[in-house]
Amino acid sequence: KTKKTTLCAGNIATAEAAKFLIKLGVDIVKVGIGPGSICTTRLVAGIGVPQLSAIIEVKKGVKNKKTKIISDGGIKYSGDIAKALSAGADAVMIGSLFAGSLETPGKLIKKNNKLYKSFRGMGSVGAMNKGSADRYFQTKQKDTSKYVPEGVEGFVKYKGNVKSIIYKLIGGLKSSMGYLGAKKITFLKNKPNFVKITKAGFYESMVHNVDEVKNESKY
C-alpha cells in the first residue's frame, strides 16, 4: 500500500475479518455475503450472515474513524439504507433497486405488454462467461457447463430514469432522519435502538388488508 492509494477489500461479515484487513492497510471494508437479490451464495456455499447483523459485527472490529464501511447488498427499501447507516455503515451499495432503470446496461424487453430489463448477478453463469469467473476461482474451468454459479439471471420491471428512484430513496432516508432527530447522517450512529420483530410484526409493517394499491411507491 502507498499513501496515494485507497484500498477497498471485501466482502466480509465478521469483526475478525475487519481487523485482519485493517492490519494490511485497507482503507475501506465491504460488508455482505449473500444478501443480494440475485445472489445464491448462502444456498450454494452455506456461507453468509444476515446483512444488518453483519454490519453490526464488522463495526466491532473497526475501532478507528479512518476506516470506512460499505454495506454491499440487501437494500430493498429506503428504510434499509437508514438501518444500514445506523448499524455502522458509512455508505451502501445498491444493485436491484437500480437494475430496472433506463441507465443500466441490461436489455429492455417487453413481456405481456410490460417492460422489463435483464438483470444478472456477478456469480451467474452469464456473468462468468463475460469475465467474472476469476472472482469465484473458476477461470481454469474451460467447460462452462461445469461452472458452479453463486448467482442467477432474471428480469426486473422497467422503472424509467434513475433520478426518480434516487429521489425517493433520499426522501425515505430524510424521513428516517427526521423521526430520529438526526440533523446529519453521522448522527444516525448515535446508539441506535434496534428491536427484533415477529413475523406478525413484519406483516403489520407492510401494506395489508388492501386488495389493490394505487400509485404503488418504490419506497
Each predicted region: which residue ranges?
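Phosphate-binding glycine-rich loops and their immediate beta-loop-alpha structural context
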Residues: 1-4, 14-16
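Short acidic loop-to-helix transition motifs that present clustered carboxylates
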Residues: 12-17, 76-78
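Glycine-rich beta-alpha junction loops
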Residues: 13-14, 35, 96-101
